[in-house]
Amino acid sequence: MPAKEVISTVRALKAIKCKGIVCYSAGFKEIGKTGKYLEDRLIKECGDTPLIGPNCYGFINFSDNLALWPFSHKGDRCKKGIALITQSGMLSSDIIMATRSLPISFMVSAGNQAVTKIEDLIFYFSKKTNVSCIAIHIEGISDLTRFLAVSYTHLRA
């Protein structure tokens, strides 16, 4: 859906007690000042509701065979595997479509990380018993202190 319609959609989802949202739509801070304004409104509208994105492909949970992903993908169900986190939708798609024998438990395309940050995902996956390791591809870190703290904690787990 167009970025300008996302805010009202989030409001409607929250009204029906939606527990989390994936926002595929682009047209937010990645396009400049107007998009940044929309993204700030999106953050405010979400409040404490988790949101992956905007400007992302979403996530795939191979362990439970669940996907909020915009198109078909490859990958086998596995009991334990890698959690892959990337900001890039295209890279996540390329990885998922490659024919490999690598056991993947989760793939997350985090996009702009308006609400749910890469650090949140690292923390979440570090607690999952079906994750053997976490692999990340990042284009930038907005909170280096938090990133290092969460990463160090995961390394010790």
Segment roles from a protein language model:
Residues 1-156:
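Catalytic-core regions of core metabolic enzymes
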